[in-house]
Design a protein with these regions (language model features):
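Active-site/ligand-binding-proximal alpha/beta "capping" segment
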Residues: 308-336, 343
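Short, solvent-exposed amphipathic alpha-helical segments in soluble enzyme
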Residues: 258-260, 323-327, 408-412, 519, ...
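Short catalytic-loop micro-motif centered on adjacent basic/acidic residues
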Residues: 240-243, 306-311, 393
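Catalytic or ion-translocation cores adjacent to nucleophile or general acid/base/metal-coordination motifs
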Residues: 202-226, 230, 236-240, 246-303, ...
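Long, compositionally biased, glycine/small-hydrophobic-enriched stretches that function as flexible linkers
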Residues: 1-195, 199-210, 364-514, 518-530, ...
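Solvent-exposed alpha-helices and their adjacent loops that cap or buttress functional pockets
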Residues: 146-148, 164-168, 183-184, 232-236, ...
Length: 660
């Protein structure tokens, strides 16, 4: 059977052969068995409803075995035999070009070069899922191949609820992930609901079909590292950036360090993750001995090298070794998946990767205890380095939050954290308040020449806009022009032919309009526009994206909800809203979109309407929180567009409130 026919078939009419568990693939950690006997029966009943009754007797013991062995029912048997990667848009069976674009994006999220745990449908972050099981994937692809531009596919946490009549102006797909009643949003609730097969953690771009490989975060990481060095007034050359994690998102750190021209040391316990990044040229060297690492780093400091080193082992050992050997760490952070601390997101010091994974399911209580002890030790050594002059920041992975829960020495006397989130110090005031965020695009032709043309177009647009840019955004413009000029040389593409670029509202709109013109003229194929959820307007997250909101509203989620609703009727091809993402389940509400543009007048209208809202909604909220940069930026936006009317805050003098 050829690819198109297999996709259009969906769940096969006859049972495919069982799949052999492939030890060469990076698999998800075994999840804790949290279900009672009655709940296990319910999980099996839930899984079996995808299949004809005649197969139930054969599938029950198989699914029961998966549930007991892995803590989840993945339905490995139904993983398709065809290769999983982003194909040219015309290769997908379709009645709707927009639906074909979504199929391309889904397959990219599950490409083994891109996805962290492809056979468990996990794209990044340890538990960031596209689907809960392979039946959901097959059924979704079938619906997408059938649908027209007058239908909308509704996705409930990976489950395709069905095609519903809509209109050409409606989204083709509406995605929700992990939407639960607030009182049932604890991490233990997620484990139970996910094991039952009724909810999932979509992270950000995993469950919304907008992941573009580690490139998706490397630009933001580069901006963060560059501005961190600027903040401490140090030239990056010969200076150290110490961090951890080489997974789907964290794997961007060594590449970003090289682009920033510093010495990057990134610890990772999973050798497969290291091998993946090393083979992709995202990290230069691999060392598994702290003595050798110390020697190598001292030489790199002496020679002011630009080099990235993966240390195979625990980050705590590196911090302690550097302290003992008087190695100055200029910038420090952490990007382990601490949003998921009990299921392999963070590995305790003193255990090998294999030992820790075994402990997760054999003795989860002890594993949790060891993680907490490790976090205490981690914080203790970071505190010592900070006293020596290290600038340490939380990289939005819940490090500060989980360390505080572990009762580590991470709080000031007033109960606030000792260290800032990178959004508080860098990304918020320098980027988000001005509307700069991770705009991205994917060439649906999958041609390198199309990507090259879009790079050139984007650069030309930015250079033109930079000529009239206000002083408070000129540095951001210049950083992004330099980024796009060096993008191809830096070999950023893993998976689909995609690019990320931090741009403000005006930049995103003008770049997209220039793409649309090039499509109309036949220079390039259709383009899929999108962004990370980690952006100006898309995410309410008090420990990350909205951590530089100080009016008390950082714990509210009106912005993210308003954003996805607004995107849905302004021209988005698909929209998504998730519980969790970045900092973790119950801590965040975040959303995103995808928009296929095809050179048409309709695409032009959608670009101007939706991209304007998608950025300025967040600037308006940040302005109301009294953020100076956002007040300036939204005022400029109102001058440019007379239809925009935003409420500006009246600032009260501090002395008037001193005696209250």
């Amino acid at each position: 059977m050829n690819f198109k026919k297999e996709v259009a078939l969906g769940i096969p009419k006859e049972l495919p052969n069982k799949k052999i568990y492939d030890p060469n693939v990076n698999h998800a950690p075994i999840r804790e068995n949290v279900l009672t006997r009655e709940e296990k029966i319910l999980a099996l009943r839930n899984a079996l409803r995808y299949f004809d009754k005649k197969f139930h007797k054969e599938l029950i013991p198989e699914f029961k075995s998966e549930l007991e062995k892995f803590g989840r029912i993945y339905m490995y048997r139904f993983r398709p035999d065809y290769k999983m990667y982003a194909r040219p848009i015309e290769d997908y069976p379709h009645n709707s070009k927009e639906a074909a674009g979504i199929m391309l994006m889904i397959q990219n999220n599950l490409d083994k070069r891109v996805a962290q745990h492809p056979h468990e449908l996990i794209t990044y972050g340890g538990n960031g899922a596209v689907f809960q099981n392979w039946a959901q994937y097959l059924l979704t692809m079938r619906y997408l191949s059938e649908m027209t531009d007058e239908q909308t596919l509704v996705m409930y946490s990976g489950h395709p609820m069905g095609l519903f009549p809509s209109s050409k102006n409606a989204p083709r797909v509406v995605v929700t992930n992990g939407m639960v009643i607030p009182n049932y949003s604890k991490k233990s609730d997620l484990e139970k609901f996910n094991a039952l097969g009724v909810s999932q953690y979509g992270q950000m771009t995993a469950g919304s079909y907008m992941y573009i490989g580690p490139q998706g975060i490397v630009h933001g990481t580069t901006i963060t590292v560059l501005n961190a060095f600027r903040k401490i007034n140090k030239n990056p050359k010969g200076k150290i950036f110490l961090t951890s994690g080489l997974g789907g998102m964290s794997g961007a750190q060594p590449k970003a360090g090289n682009i920033s021209e510093c010495i990057t040391i990134c610890a990772e316990v999973n050798i497969k993750a290291i091998e993946t990044r090393h083979s992709q040229n995202w990290v230069d060297e691999v060392i598994d001995d702290t003595e050798k690492l110390v020697e190598r780093v001292k030489n790199a400091q002496k020679n002011k090298e630009i080099v990235s080193i993966a240390y195979h082992g625990n980050i705590v050992d590196v911090w302690e070794s550097f302290y003992e050997n008087n190695i100055t760490v200029d910038i420090g952070s952490d990007q382990t998946s601490l949003h998921n601390p009990w299921s392999g997101g963070y590995y305790p010091v003193g255990y090998s990767f294999e030992e820790a994974n075994k402990l997760i399911y054999e003795n989860p209580k002890k594993f949790k205890s060891e993680v907490k002890l490790s976090l205490k030790r981690h914080v203790e050594i970071v505190n010592k380095h900070v006293k020596r002059g290290t600038y340490f920041f939380d990289y939005g992975n819940a490090f500060l939050l989980e360390a505080s829960k572990a009762e580590a020495d991470i709080l000031k006397k007033d109960g606030s954290f000792k260290y800032p989130s990178y959004v508080q110090d860098i990304m918020g005031p320098m980027c988000f308040d001005y509307g700069f965020g991770p705009f991205r695009w994917v060439c649906s032709s999958c041609k390198q020449e199309d990507l090259d043309i879009t790079d050139t177009i984007a650069c030309e647009v930015l250079e033109k806009l930079a000529l009239s840019a206000p002083e408070d955004t000129k540095q951001q413009m210049m950083d992004n022009i330099q980024w796009i000029k060096a993008a191809k040389e830096n070999e950023l593409v893993v998976g689909s032919k995609a690019r990320i670029l931090y741009a403000d509202s005006n930049g995103r709109i003008e770049i997209a309009k220039a793409f649309n013109k090039a499509i109309k003229e036949g220079k390039i194929g259709p383009i899929i526009l999108g962004r990370d959820h980690h952006d100006v307007s898309g995410t309410d997250s008090p420990y990350r994206e909205t951590s530089n909101i100080y009016d008390g509203s950082q714990f509210t989620a009106d912005m993210a909800i308003q954003n996805v609703i607004g995107d849905s009727f302004r021209g988005a091809t698909w929209v998504s809203i998730h519980n969790g993402g970045g900092v973790g389940w119950g801590e965040v509400i975040n959303g995103g979109f995808g928009m296929l543009i095809d050179g048409s007048e309709k695409s032009e209208i959608n670009i101007e309407s939706m991209l304007f809202w998608d950025v300025n909604n967040g600037i308006a909220r940040r302005n109301w929180a009294r953020n100076k940069g956002a007040i300036n930026q939204i005022s400029r936006a109102m001058q440019k567009n007379p239809k925009l009317k935003v409420t500006l805050p009246n600032l009260v003098e501090d002395k008037l409130l001193e005696n209250i």
